[in-house]
Amino acid sequence: MQNQKNQKSLVAKVLVLFAAVALMFVGVQVFADDKLDLNTLECKDALELTAADAADAEKVVKQWKVQNTSLNAKVTKDSVKVAVADNKVTVTPADGDAGKALSGSKILNLVGVCELNKLTLGTEKKLTLTVKDGKVDAEAGLKALKEAGAKVPATVNKDDVTFTVGKDDNANKVTVKAVDGKTTVSGQVVFEFTVAKTPWYKTVWFLTLVAVVVVAAVAGGVFFFVKKNKKNK
């Protein structure tokens, strides 16, 4: 009788052990199948990165998130590695444990060289610029281009272009030209522009009025203080 109980107990333990091993195997398979395939992830547009910047996984992931705000959290600067070639960047899982949650690869396009002669503006068709001493600040000019609907990638900065205002009959036109030797931008384009209106609180007459009021207030305060001291004496 006792032997039968021992045998039943042993059989039960063996069954439990087999069940545990089976569950463990299933768990491993589920985990293995739960890997995220990079190729299934979307990227709306080309990444606004230079080839040099695209060699940095952190910058690639950051730009990818700009194009795909719901990018899976498994994709991080540490979980992927990148390789750049032919104006494209290939994203693959990082080596070792860092990339074990990922599989496959994803090829992302880079914006490449911005060809200025291909830029177009929105419905306004004109830029709004602030001209000082016949010149336009490049940083402000790039901002005006983007506000007017021109698709200028983030790879183009104020050191890459110049804005030159025309003369005589072309005084209402500005030439945007790539600086020689730059790899992010090329060519040139001419746009019509209107001069930005100065806000009333920045006009000369308003600033002069404020200065006069401040001086008058200070002078009045000094006069009152001196007069009061004389009375006290």
UniProtKB/Swiss-Prot annotation:
Pfam families in the record: Phyto-Amp
Organism of derivation: Onion yellows phytoplasma (strain OY-M)
Signal peptide: 1-32
InterPro entries reported for this sequence: Phyto-Amp
The keyword Membrane appears for this protein: yes
Keyword Lipoprotein assigned: no
Protein name in UniProt: Antigenic membrane protein
Key words, A-Z: Cell membrane, Membrane, Signal, Transmembrane, Transmembrane helix
Bilayer disposition of the protein: Single-pass membrane protein
Lineage: Bacteria, Bacillati, Mycoplasmatota, Mollicutes, Acholeplasmatales
One Gene Ontology cellular component annotation held by this UniProt entry: plasma membrane
Localisation per UniProt entry: Cell membrane
Residue ranges crossing the lipid bilayer per the database entry: 206-226
